[in-house]
Design a protein with these regions (language model features):
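Active-site-proximal alpha-helix that buttresses catalytic centers in soluble enzyme cores
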Residues: 2-81, 123, 131-132, 167
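Short alpha-helix plus adjacent loop in nuclease-associated cores
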Residues: 81-94
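Generic beta-sheet signal
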Residues: 4, 99-106
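Flexible, glycine-rich active-site loops centered on histidine and acidic residues
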Residues: 103, 113-127
Length: 167
């Protein structure tokens, strides 16, 4: 059994229009949301052993906000290929994962498309199709190796958006 925690980066800042997209940090709401997500993940024992993260600033800072709440220290792997990746690239990266529980942190629109294609049946949450900032899907796969994961084979275990935690 393998478990994927699929998280879109938290809310980023657009304060400086000259900041390149890749370098945009989180805004205050995003920082708070990342911390809330960390608490939510830890409270449900959704703890990754490995984190596959886009190398953009906002995805790295999302993980930095989540990490303090997690027991242990998951291995963080920055993956430039995940920056604005589509579902096929995301799947290729996932198939090289090693831990039983993996977190992937990426960007829309690719992450929403990837989530939709991964699970056999989408969660009932109306935000799933939109996959807003901080949205997190937890999905299980009945495989022994990540290399065997296929689109449509995941079972949605949980789905949350940050405002549902804080609100």
């Amino acid at each position: 059994m393998k478990r994927l925690i699929l998280t879109r980066h938290a809310k980023s800042s657009w304060d400086d229009p000259l900041t390149p997209d890749h370098d945009r940090p989180l805004n205050e709401r995003g920082k708070a949301a990342a911390a809330d997500l960390g608490q939510w993940l830890a409270s449900r024992d959704y703890v990754p052993g490995e984190v596959l993260c886009s190398d953009a600033v906002r995805t790295r800072k999302t993980f930095s906000g989540i990490a303090p709440a997690l027991p242990g220290a998951p291995v963080l792997e920055l993956k430039p290929a995940l920056y604005h990746a589509g579902p096929d690239v995301m799947m290729a990266v996932l198939r090289h994962a090693r831990a039983d529980v993996v977190m992937m942190i990426g960007h829309n629109p690719g992450i929403a498309e990837f989530a939709a294609r991964l699970v056999a049946h989408p969660p009932s949450n109306p935000e799933f199709a939109r996959y807003p900032t901080g949205a997190t899907l937890v999905a299980d796969f009945d495989v022994a190796d990540w290399a065997d994961v296929a689109f449509g084979s995941g079972v949605a275990v949980d789905f949350i958006v940050p405002r549902e935690i804080a609100g």
